[in-house]
């Protein structure tokens, strides 16, 4: 990859969330703590699901996949940021930047698709309870996860490969704590119209499509819950999807907030600080949301730890 004047570009500078020297120690401790909580929390969900045979159901199969993706998602960005803060070095190589961008797109896409699959699972469980295990059979569950991976990989590879031919100018500073594709593309010296079109199309198709599916699923779920006569039955039905609805609201709400913030304030640290919500905070909170009021997960964790003693 070459710059506009044919000199080789080997690295970018990640400016991070803040350039204030007095904040670096605080940011390091904060993000290290959040990273460890995220990894351990999601790892516990995976181990509890695997170790308890009662949780070998479609709902918890998808949840364990989401937890695995969240671990990978946060591991794509935070460790590099921690290294940069600790070493006082903002450099990321060109190859490292493209790789980070590729994996970030992969895992954010997987989060998106898995949340949609989980919404469909809740739709079948509440609207077609008698046929739930027939419809959500192991083959379909595996195919849904596989399809999520395939679509995410294709999107990630397409957008990352389209960055490779772009020539870059001498201004190589990225006002972010990771190589966010929109920020990187707009550092290029050439016309990025095609890249922008592909990015907007991907957001509309791969973001809007799953969100539409989630909204449709929940519209049917709400209709089914309203048809239940007893208050206890309504509460029980709603409680089975309350955690998922909370995670969906958090994920899409923070994503929307980030892009609105980025649109309002170009080339500032505001967008980077806002993106912490869906890149770090959401994966960290997911295990707490799913386990806080879920007696099956809490019971599986207790059994798991008792078995280790």
Curated annotation (Swiss-Prot):
Gene Ontology CC annotations of this record: plasma membrane
Membrane topology designation: Multi-pass membrane protein
Topology, Cytoplasmic side: 47-54, 121-139, 218-237, 293-309
Superkingdom in the source lineage: Eukaryota
Keyword Signal: no
Cysteines joined through disulfide linkages: 97-189
Residue positions the entry lists as glycosylated: 5
Positions on the Extracellular side per record topology: 1-25, 76-99, 161-197, 259-271
Keywords: Cell membrane, Disulfide bond, G-protein coupled receptor, Glycoprotein, Membrane, Olfaction, Receptor, Sensory transduction, Transducer, Transmembrane, Transmembrane helix
Positions of transmembrane segments: 26-46, 55-75, 100-120, 140-160, 198-217, 238-258, 272-292
Molecular function (Gene Ontology), one example: G protein-coupled receptor activity
GO biological process: signal transduction
Primary location recorded for the protein, binned into one broad class: membrane
Family recorded in the similarity comment: Belongs to the G-protein coupled receptor 1 family.
Role: Odorant receptor.
UniProt name for this protein: Olfactory receptor 7A10
